[in-house]
């Protein structure tokens, strides 16, 4: 049974992970894994990159997110995608699905993990750099943010940035990872995007 706690309603901003939380990128991920060994910027790599981005462009938000998007818009909540993926990918998905009502063009709300001031930032191994960068860019305090992700590393990185974290189980493919999240006593678990609304009311 998933764990749920009452979240303080004085939040100001929501951080969403991209791959496996907001968007179903499973087909793009499979393609990327098959081409991991390619040397960067070779003709083969460029062709593989082009096909990967085509898969990304075809990716859609998981079922249930439309209700969450409406809740965010209706309640004037600030939302941001904070991901280790590139900003190019995040922008492409937002544009392809026309999500500018949720992530407006004229605001900083897509924080990519690569090439931020020349440094690659990830949430791996609980590194909070990406979250700290997002807090600074959006000018919000960590206690005013809730982060939603589909991996233990997302929660650990949020913890180290002082942000409340929630596990999202719908995009978790590995059973071991899913069980780790279910057994985690320190973070809420939810099994559908619609439960985000229940947590925030």
Regions found by a protein language model. Give the residues of each.
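Substrate-recognition "cap/lid" segment bordering the active-site pocket of phosphatases
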Residues: 87-146, 152, 156, 160, ...
């Amino acid at each position: 049974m998933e764990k749920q706690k009452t979240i303080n309603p004085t939040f100001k901003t929501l951080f969403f992970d991209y791959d496996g939380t907001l968007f179903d990128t499973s087909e793009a991920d499979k393609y990327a894994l098959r081409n991991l060994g390619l040397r960067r910027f070779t003709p083969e790599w460029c062709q593989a990159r082009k096909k990967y981005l085509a898969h990304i462009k075809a990716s859609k938000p998981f079922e249930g997110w439309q209700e969450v998007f409406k809740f965010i818009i209706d309640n004037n909540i600030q939302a941001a995608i904070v991901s280790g993926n590139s900003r190019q990918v995040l922008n492409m998905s937002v544009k392809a699905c026309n999500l500018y009502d949720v992530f407006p063009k004229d605001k900083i709300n897509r924080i990519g993990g690569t090439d931020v001031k020349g440094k690659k930032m990830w949430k791996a191994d609980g590194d909070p750099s990406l979250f700290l960068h997002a807090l600074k860019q959006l000018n919000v305090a960590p206690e005013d943010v809730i982060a939603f992700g589909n991996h233990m590393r997302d929660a650990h990185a949020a913890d180290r940035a002082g942000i409340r974290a929630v596990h999202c189980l719908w995009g978790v493919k590995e059973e071991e990872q899913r069980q780790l999240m279910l057994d985690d006593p320190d973070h809420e678990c939810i099994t559908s995007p619609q439960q985000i609304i229940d947590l925030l009311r």
